[in-house]
Each structure stands twice: as structure tokens, then as C-alpha cells.
Amino acid sequence: MRAQDLPPLPETPGVYLWKRGEEVLYVGKAKSLRARVKSYFHAEGKARRIAEEATGLDFIATRDEVEALLLEANLIKAHRPLYNVLLKDDKHYPFLKLTNEPFPTLLVVRRVEEDGAKYYGPFPEAGALRRIKTLIDRLFPLRKNSGYPMKRRRYPCLNYSMGRCLAPCVGKADPEAYQEVVRQVEAVLEGRVDGLLQELEAKMREAARRLEFERAAEIRDQMEALRAFFSTDQQAFDPEMGDLDFLGMARSGALAVVQLYQVRSGRILGRISRVVEKEEATDEEILWAFLRDHYLEASPLPPLVLLPFPLEDLESLAELLKRRAGRKVELRVPKKGEKARLLELAERNARLALETELKLRERRGEHPALKALQDLLGLPARPWRLEGYDISHLQGQARVFSIAVFEGGRPKRQEYRRMRLKAGNDDYAAMEEGVFRRYTGSLKDLPLPDLLLIDGGVGQVRAAARALERAGLRLPLVGLAKGEEVLVTPEGRELRLPLTHPALQLLIHLRDEAHQNGLRYHRKRRSEELFRVLQGIPGIGEKRRRLLLERYGGLRALKEAPLEELARLPGMSLEAARALKAALAEEEPA
């Protein structure tokens, strides 16, 4: 694209999208749209190449830089542009949600919504989330079994009898007492445990003073459980350090690891780690992408974030954090003292994580097509786990959704799955149902893939994309249409490759594995149906049943076999063949 072909650009904050046809190549934000976009034509390296490859430019003016930052993040997630830094392992880590109701409940969710609820997380380790949720359920009597929003019940549940719920669903809870419990749960989730323990100790002493010894004992047990949990589950630092996040980063060539540690009340609450593989991205671009994506959802926010090196344009991020937290959040690069030593700790651990990742890749012996696939589709890293999806049916009925899994470019058949579908003769509806159930049903806890392959054209691919959106997920996906072996994207873009291309060969193998997985189900079903019919026919014993199953496989083929052919089979007689044909004639068509 030439500079003279640019649309008129304002000197205001906003977001710009470099495009090649309908494909978005890069999304960026700017204090001045005009100055930032025009700078691409005087730049070198990646920026210059983006301008040269682009055939068009869209822009959206915003009121301020914070709005531009938010819009940039949303557009990057929506379009996953080729030249933006995309974080690997964007697996939608779970959050704890304290619902916005008169009697709130605590839920595990994977999406943060603008619904007035309070969100805590993300929790990168499922075990940590499980432990804190179990602790809260045991020690604090929030409602648990009356749904969201709360449904009225006729009788209280067992939790009420055990003292673990105040039973607001049957009108037994005092609103003021319930809100006191909510406040205590918030203190635990925000890491303000020391203050909560002091408060509980005062209540215990007051209960003892009133001779309410049973209540005092309950509070004592609650305090001991909290102390035990927070002394064993978290690494203690200096309590004077308070609440903060600190980050470390390590890099080797195109591969980088960024880690963030969350410290609350002087204790490490958790660590979040991301892997990025982007040849041309600078360290600053990688760290900025991590900060933007993490702090758009993370909650609660600390008053201090320690960065490993300075970044340009941190003012917009600091302002965004201030608006989200309702107070100032300082972004600082300490050079000495205890906080600088925290950064050294984070960098050492990021370096260890990077070395582990490199050794794992070396041991895996990654398939050479994975790098070709990454480059072809503009993925943030080599796609280690691939899942292929296929819809098959038996004579227009019994539609089946089949899943094949590759890891490191090789089949992982122990994780192949199949599911019967409810959708009728609509292939698109069947694909949407199958993909949605894969990520919300009994298979939802399987690892998320780095790339989805859909057996079909743009219609099936878009149906899969709708299912992912309904499930609250953003995963790269592509379709492979039979016949011409053309790759298609959800936007309708076609990628035509020579059959010798390693990425295409790998995807064809994956698609065929998914298809064969479905066919195996239908063969098994035909055999079971035939076995059922043969069981009730006089003169057809176990040996003859086995022979007919091996020879014909299904009911239709057996019905079409001539009488003379059946009679000539080893172990069969003309009388047995006639009995078989008579029984088959009475069988309802499949």
C-alpha cells in the first residue's frame, strides 16, 4: 500500500487495522492516528513490511488512549492478526465469581462479564482454585445449591443442617448476617487474611465473654483452618511487602517465557506463565502484550506492579488500571533493594521455564510440518496439539461427531473420541452441536488444542466458529475441503497449496484420521445390528454368526446376498440359508 492511498486520518487517539483484502494483518493503537500510521512508511523491518503487504487500512477514533487500549485488545483477540504478538496458552484460565445478588453465591467461571459481579483470578493452577473454593465452602456459609440466580426452595438442603449455609433460598437468612459472610469471603479472596484473623479473634473473645462457648469454639476452628491453609499453601515473603505483582522474562531466539507472581499480604498467591514464539517481536512488544491481556481481566488489582524493564506508553495502561481498581496502580522498574531482588527471582524462574520448554521440544522431536503450519496460518507458536473434527452418518441417520488428536504432529489415538448427535440432516447444525459439546460437555476438561481442523468447507468452519463463540473460547481453526484439498478460514479465505506442502500433508492425515474414527463407529454399529438379528434365527449358531459377520459386516449387505451364495458358504446349508433369508425379509429396513 502506498502512503498516498491512505484515507484521511485524524490527529486523535484510536485504533488502526492494516488489512490484506479481508484479512487483518496487524492491529495497533495510537495517541495520534495520523502520525502513527504515516510512520510505517518511513520505518524499517516489520513495520515497513506490514505497510507493503497491506492493501487497505481501517481505523476507529476513540475518546482517549485508555479506550484505544481496550479496543485494541478486543480486536486482537477477535482477529488474531498475523503480525501481532499472540500469547500461547491463552486457555481461558478459570475465575471465581461472587455473583451480584442480594444473597450472592461463589461460582467457578471462565469468562469475565460486565454484570456487576466480583471476579477473582485468573487461577492458572486448577488445584489452587479447588483448594481455596473448598476452604470457603467449608468455613463460610454462603448458599451453594439454589442455583444462579437464586431459586426459591420449599426445604433447606443438607448444607443448612451441617451449618454450612444460611438457607436464604427458604427465607431463613438474615440479610445483614449474610452480607457479613460475603465480606469475609471477599477478604479471603483478596488476600486480606491477617486483618480477617484479627477480626475473628475479637469476635471469638466477645463470644466467650458472653459465655457463648460453642460459638467461640466455631470461630477458633475457623481461624485455625485459615492459618493452616495460608501457611502451607503459599510461600511467605516479608509481610511488610503488602500487595504487589512482579514479572520476569527470558528469551532464546524466537521463543520467550513471561511469568507474573501475585503477592498478597506478603504471601505468593500464584504464578501465571505464558509462552510466546514470534521471530520478529521485540522484548518490549512481548511484555506489553502480556500486561495488556492479563490486566484487562485480572482481579483484584494490586497497588504496585514491578516490571523487568521500562516500556513506552505505560501511561495508558496505568490509567486503565486506575479506572479498574478505583485507585492508583503504580508501574515501576526497581533498580535496587528487596523489590529488585524479586525481579531477579522472577527472571531466574522464567529462565528455568524457558530451558524446560526448549528441552521438551527437543525430546518431543517435533514434526517438521508444525513450523510450516505456524508460518502458514500466522499462529503465535508451533501448534503442538491439533484436533480434527468430522461428521459422519449411516444412510442419512445416526450422525456422529468424531475427534482425532495429534500431538507433536503424530496421532494420539488414546484421546480419540466420538459422540452421537441430536441434529437431524443439517450438516452445519451437526458440526455446531459437536464442537459446542466438545468444549462444554463431558470432554471439556481435555486439553485445549492449539489448532482445530474441520472436515469441510466454509459453512462447516463458520458453524464451528459459532460453537466456539457460544462456549466463550477463541481458538484458531481452519477447514479442509475434500476433493481439491483447499484450506478455508472462517472469513472465507482459501489457501491453495501443492500436495507436497508439509503442512497440507499433516492436515490431510489428521482429517483422514477423524473420518476413519467415525467410520469405525458405524462399522461397529452395523456389526452389532447384524449380530442382534442373527441371534434370533433358528439354525444360525455362534460359528455361522461369526462367519456372516466377517463376510458381510452389516445388515444391508447380508440382505442383498443371493440365496445360492449364502448356501455355498462354509458351514452353511440350503435350509439354514432359507431360514436366514426368511428372517431377514421380516426385519424392518434400517
From Swiss-Prot:
Entry's Gene Ontology BP terms: nucleotide-excision repair; SOS response
Domain GIY-YIG: from-to ranges: 11-85
| InterPro entries listed in its UniProt record | GIY-YIG_endonuc, GIY-YIG_endonuc_sf, GIY-YIG_UvrC_Cho, Hlx-hairpin-Hlx_DNA-bd_motif, RuvA_2-like, UVR_dom, UVR_dom_sf, UvrABC_protein_C
Q: What is its main location?
A: cytoplasm
Query: What is a single Pfam family found in this protein's UniProt entry?
Result: HHH_5
Q: Which domain of life is it from?
A: Bacteria
Recite the UniProt keywords alphabetically: Cytoplasm, DNA damage, DNA excision, DNA repair, Excision nuclease, SOS response
Q: Which GO terms describe its cellular component?
A: cytoplasm; excinuclease repair complex
Query: Where does this polypeptide localize?
Result: Cytoplasm
Signal sequence span per UniProt? Answer: none
Gene3D superfamilies xref list: 5' to 3' exonuclease, C-terminal subdomain (1.10.150.20), GIY-YIG endonuclease (3.40.1440.10), UVR domain (4.10.860.10), UvrC, RNAse H endonuclease domain (3.30.420.340)
Residue stretches making up the UVR domain: 194-229
List, in alphabetical order, the Gene Ontology terms for molecular function in this entry: DNA binding; excinuclease ABC activity
The record's comment on protein family reads:
Belongs to the UvrC family.
* The protein's assembly and partners: Interacts with UvrB in an incision complex.
Q: What does this protein do?
A: The UvrABC repair system catalyzes the recognition and processing of DNA lesions. UvrC both incises the 5' and 3' sides of the lesion. The N-terminal half is responsible for the 3' incision and the C-terminal half is responsible for the 5' incision.
Please give the name of this protein: UvrABC system protein C
Q: Which organism is it from?
A: Thermus thermophilus (strain ATCC 27634 / DSM 579 / HB8)
| Gene assigned in the entry | uvrC
